[in-house]
């Protein structure tokens, strides 16, 4: 490119693309090419609604600037494929999204950044937000002054490769790879292998027949009841939805929106080992705990923003919190005591919300912190929908060793 204050350069894109296709016909041309497009940011984040069938004309096509102006869009627009937008377009393009991000703070090598390589937890999150959101991932790994990839970068890439292979090697859903032809309102149940722990849902469309899903919901059957664990809009080649650990016996998928008949090629459930990003402070609450207060007891240690302080009581006592204002709660976090003695760690629970502190609604959750006895890290429970609430209540049902003790290192609420 021209660089800062550089002279504007003109490129013969037609000749460049023809040369690529002649010499490397299977090469993927990005951004100025018409195979994949830039997602619109360099933070490793795909859109939650991502259409590969889009009204965005490739930049190299004649008249693209006029089309962008007429439709009011560019590569960074949030909406590139809605029905409303497509209805205004004269052409539609199969132009999938490419998420671009660097494994380091910048795109080029700097020795002082050798210890600033993205953590495995961060890269896995990027994978879910890119490949898991119907995009391809371009992960930049800059060569060092030797012309080689630095050892730290190579180590992290190997870790990422092994983590992804291990996570998605074994689909726990029985017959999940059979084609399901469905329309809006259709529901399909799948059996899950017995005695397996899962926390990641996968759904794929047969994109040789196009991209058509506009909305879907996911429920798992566990502990004798169906639980809503997630929902999404577009699917495309692949959509991944993480949810709280569950010993699911069945999974149920419902198509809530579609452009005609949809062709689902794969349904999967997997278990992704939890990762803690040691390079970053784990945020347990999306809502600041300042101004929170517990109701009916002194349990300040559970809401002081410090995992190392613990509220403990010698009974299975519900923890009630007044947040001081109403928010839309999408889930909650529970951190057990960060010490060797795990007595009081909650295993099974109920979670309630209230707008006035009097009338309570039980939230739809699996109701257990699976494997917390052997992996006592913070657990994040997402409901798959939101509840308006000023108050919330965590009710312990059983402790990990069936003792009448409750311990909370920290509790928080999630907004997304």
At which residue positions do the language-model features occur?
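Mature catalytic domains of secreted/periplasmic carbohydrate-active enzymes
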Residues: 1-223, 228-243, 254-266, 270-274, ...
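Predominantly extracellular/luminal regions of secreted and cell-surface proteins
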Residues: 90, 274-304
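Trp- and acidic/polar-enriched beta-sheet ligand-binding modules for extracellular glycan
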Residues: 180-184, 207-272, 314-317, 338-416
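Extended extracellular/luminal ectodomain segments enriched in beta-structured repeat modules
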Residues: 193-200, 248, 316, 324-333, ...
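C-terminal luminal/periplasmic domains and tails of membrane-associated envelope-modifying transferases
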Residues: 199, 282, 307-320, 331, ...
């Amino acid at each position: 490119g021209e660089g800062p204050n550089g002279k504007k350069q003109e490129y013969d894109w037609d000749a460049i693309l023809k040369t690529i296709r002649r010499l490397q016909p299977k090469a993927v041309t990005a951004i100025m090419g018409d195979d994949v497009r830039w997602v619109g940011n360099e933070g490793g984040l795909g859109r939650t609604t991502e259409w590969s069938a889009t009204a965005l004309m490739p930049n190299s096509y004649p008249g693209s600037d006029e089309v962008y102006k007429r439709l009011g869009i560019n590569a960074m627009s949030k909406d590139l494929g809605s029905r409303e937008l497509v209805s205004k377009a004269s052409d539609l393009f199969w132009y999938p999204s490419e998420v671009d991000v660097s494994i380091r703070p910048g795109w080029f090598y700097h020795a002082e950044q050798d210890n600033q390589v993205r953590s495995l937890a961060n890269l896995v999150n990027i994978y879910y937000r890119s490949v898991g959101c119907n995009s391809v991932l371009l992960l930049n790994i800059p060569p060092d002054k030797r012309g080689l990839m630095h050892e730290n970068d190579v180590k992290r890439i190997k870790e990422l490769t092994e983590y992804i292979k291990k996570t998605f090697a074994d689909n726990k859903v029985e017959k999940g790879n059979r084609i399901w032809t469905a329309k809006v309102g259709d529901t399909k149940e799948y059996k899950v292998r017995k005695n397996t722990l899962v926390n990641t849902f996968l759904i794929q469309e047969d994109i040789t027949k196009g991209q058509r899903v506009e909305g879907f919901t996911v429920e798992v059957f566990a502990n004798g009841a169906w639980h809503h664990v997630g929902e999404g809009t577009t699917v495309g080649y692949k959509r991944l939805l993480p949810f709280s650990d569950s010993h699911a016996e069945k999974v149920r998928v419902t198509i809530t929106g579609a452009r005609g008949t949809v062709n689902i090629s794969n349904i999967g459930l997997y278990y992704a080992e939890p990762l803690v990003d040691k390079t970053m402070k784990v945020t347990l609450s999306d809502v600041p705990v300042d101004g929170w207060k517990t109701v009916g007891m002194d349990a300040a240690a559970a809401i002081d923003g410090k995992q190392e302080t613990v509220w403990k009581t010698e009974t299975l006592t519900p923890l009630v919190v007044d947040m001081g204002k109403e928010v839309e709660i999408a889930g909650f976090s529970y951190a057990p005591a960060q010490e060797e003695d795990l007595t009081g760690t909650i295993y099974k629970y109920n979670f309630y919300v209230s707008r006035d502190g009097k009338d309570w609604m039980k939230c739809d959750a699996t109701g257990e912190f699976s494997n917390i006895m052997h992996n006592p890290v913070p657990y994040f429970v997402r409901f798959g929908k939101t509840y308006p609430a000023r108050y919330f209540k965590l009710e312990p049902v059983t402790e990990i060793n069936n003792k009448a003790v409750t311990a909370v290192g920290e509790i928080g609420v999630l907004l997304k």
